[in-house]
Amino acid sequence: MRTSQYLLSTLKETPADAVVISHQLLLRAGMIRRLASGLYTWLPMGLRVLRKVETIVREEMNAAGALEVLMPAVQPAELWQESGRWEQYGPELLRLKDRHEREFCVGPTHEEVITDLARNELNSYKQLPINFYQIQTKFRDEIRPRFGLMRGREFIMKDAYSFHLSQDSLQQTYDGMYQAYSKIFSRLGLDFRPVQADNGSIGGSGSHEFHVLANSGEDDIVFSDSSDYAANIEKAEAVPRESARGSATEDMRLVDTPNTKTIAALVDGFQLPIEKTIKTLVVHGAEEGTLVALIVRGDHELNEIKAANQPLVASPLVFASEAEIRAAIGAGPGSLGPVNLPIACIVDRSVALMSDFAAGANIEDKHYFGVNWERDLPLPEVADLRNVVEGDPSPDGKGTLVIKRGIEVGHIFQLGTKYSEAMKLSVLSEQGKPVNLIMGCYGIGVSRVVAAAIEQNHDERGILWPSALAPFQIALVPLKYETESVKQATDKLYAELTAAGFEVLLDDRDKKTSPGVKFADMELIGIPHRIVISDRGLSEGVLEYKGRRDSESQNLPIGELMSFITEKLSR
């Protein structure tokens, strides 16, 4: 491809609304352009990268035995009402009506549509297991689209759905998808981690996320420094560092604590170690009209997913208002604790091992100091309620936990029978009896992968594409292309490289574009290999080569270039 026949739309300045580096570089390199909030047009350069991601995803899904389909982006409301998600999904679901006042939505995901397809096409156990996938545009009406492709409203996703008669069959396909995803992200050249995850609103049981490691990632991922244990922050099990509760050394006493509504104020005002304080948070209970107190140590954070999974707690999690708290307990936030607490209470494992701790007295502006379980109050229900912190013991007993930032690019779920039961999807078993099918769900954020790759691979000059993703493999940059000798040598080399199957961008812009600008553009775009053809080099029988990740260029004899490039690109 020649730049004279191509849309090369690089920008010198970074647009003001671009915050993260991937958004900045995608705009500056002329790969995408903003149409509206969270909506982007893919320009030719960016589309080449996107298609490469799609190709690798498609190849590995096909190799794993999945069957490609393409489902409508617009979905009838009746299907979502059948599954119960029409109301549950919330404002992110873009709803619309046609001219006949029939309700539809623009699909953020396709569980309902694929379940409807399956119940119309599958009728016998002999057709199972089966795994369908598509690569398609989705839409979620994010309240604050941000970070370019990282969190847009419209995005491209590969979603797959498998159907099974048994849990064992699902597990086999799930394991196959786990391996396929690992191959996909390895082929894409990304440093990634698969981690245990919570299924969230999509439902079901087992789940893994695939994260690209990057300091700019939105998610905390947790893994052991001595084993294969890995989970996201929502799922990671928090194991107390203490093996047993310490002995009581203080008497419990009631202390005036005026204007002490936060842990920081309690610690600073009374010279308490933060490890000797607790936080009491009040949420709605599973039983209508009830409240439940959740207690974590002062230096720990409540894990809302773990909290919502407690049988006593309403899901989704709803925090009680101050008015509700005062009506039920007689004191407000900042003065709450487990002593004489008139509502149900669950404490975190670390709290259960505390001694001589400080807690709100459920009396305004008062705390109890020197509180000890069993002596001063019975130990309530104990559960894992908190986020892990770096240095916690690994749940598998091997090593300690490390926390890094990650960008979620893939997620696989074991859905169970949630959708098949709701939408009456069943087939006849070998015994001739109807059986609800067990489902799996497997997603990859295809357009997000492009942004994640940049977040992980860039420098001060631009993008450092993994070789599998670069829009072009080779940039040919002639100096004074209008010179006959340079033009002939460049055109000959371009023909040889393209004939050999290499993807080449020939920068044949005229002399108004300086060599420095050409070099800067090729580095910004992230083309891995640059070859410079000059009159001086030709007179010496050499061409200048520079790898995008190299600090220095080198001269190569013209006759050796093809073998050199072939060897470089075969790695």
From Swiss-Prot:
Q: Which domain of life is it from?
A: Bacteria
Q: List, alphabetically, the Gene3D superfamilies matched.
A: Anticodon-binding domain (3.40.50.800), Bira Bifunctional Protein, Domain 2 (3.30.930.10), YbaK/aminoacyl-tRNA synthetase-associated domain (3.90.960.10)
Q: Which CDD domains match?
A: ProRS-INS, ProRS_anticodon_short, ProRS_core_prok
| SUPFAM superfamilies xref list | Class II aaRS ABD-related (SSF52954), Class II aaRS and biotin synthetases (SSF55681), YbaK/ProRS associated domain (SSF55826)
What are the GO BP annotations of this UniProt entry?
Answer: prolyl-tRNA aminoacylation
Localization recorded for this chain is: Cytoplasm
The EC number of this protein is 6.1.1.15
Q: Does the keyword Cell inner membrane apply?
A: no
Which Gene Ontology CC terms are recorded? cytosol
- GO molecular function terms noted in the UniProt entry: aminoacyl-tRNA deacylase activity; ATP binding; proline-tRNA ligase activity
Q: Which InterPro entries match?
A: aa-tRNA-synt_IIb, aa-tRNA-synth_II, aa-tRNA-synth_II/BPL/LPL, Anticodon-bd, Anticodon-bd_dom_sf, Pro-tRNA-ligase_IIa, Pro-tRNA-synth_IIa_bac-type, Pro-tRNA-Synthase_IIa_type1
Q: Which reaction does it catalyse?
A: tRNA(Pro) + L-proline + ATP = L-prolyl-tRNA(Pro) + AMP + diphosphate
Q: Which Pfam family, any one of them, does this sequence belong to?
A: HGTP_anticodon
What's the main place this protein lives? cytoplasm
Q: Which UniProt keywords apply?
A: Aminoacyl-tRNA synthetase, ATP-binding, Cytoplasm, Ligase, Nucleotide-binding, Protein biosynthesis
The family assignment reads: Belongs to the class-II aminoacyl-tRNA synthetase family. ProS type 1 subfamily.
According to its UniProt entry, the function of this protein is described as: Catalyzes the attachment of proline to tRNA(Pro) in a two-step reaction: proline is first activated by ATP to form Pro-AMP and then transferred to the acceptor end of tRNA(Pro). As ProRS can inadvertently accommodate and process non-cognate amino acids such as alanine and cysteine, to avoid such errors it has two additional distinct editing activities against alanine. One activity is designated as 'pretransfer' editing and involves the tRNA(Pro)-independent hydrolysis of activated Ala-AMP.
Q: How does it assemble?
A: Homodimer.
The cross-references to NCBIfam families, in alphabetical order and at most eight, read:
PRK09194.1, proS_fam_II
User: Domain note for this entry?
Assistant: Consists of three domains: the N-terminal catalytic domain, the editing domain and the C-terminal anticodon-binding domain.
Protein name as it appears in the record: Proline--tRNA ligase
What's the source species for this entry?
Pseudomonas aeruginosa (strain ATCC 15692 / DSM 22644 / CIP 104116 / JCM 14847 / LMG 12228 / 1C / PRS 101 / PAO1)
| Taxonomy of the source species | Bacteria, Pseudomonadati, Pseudomonadota, Gammaproteobacteria, Pseudomonadales
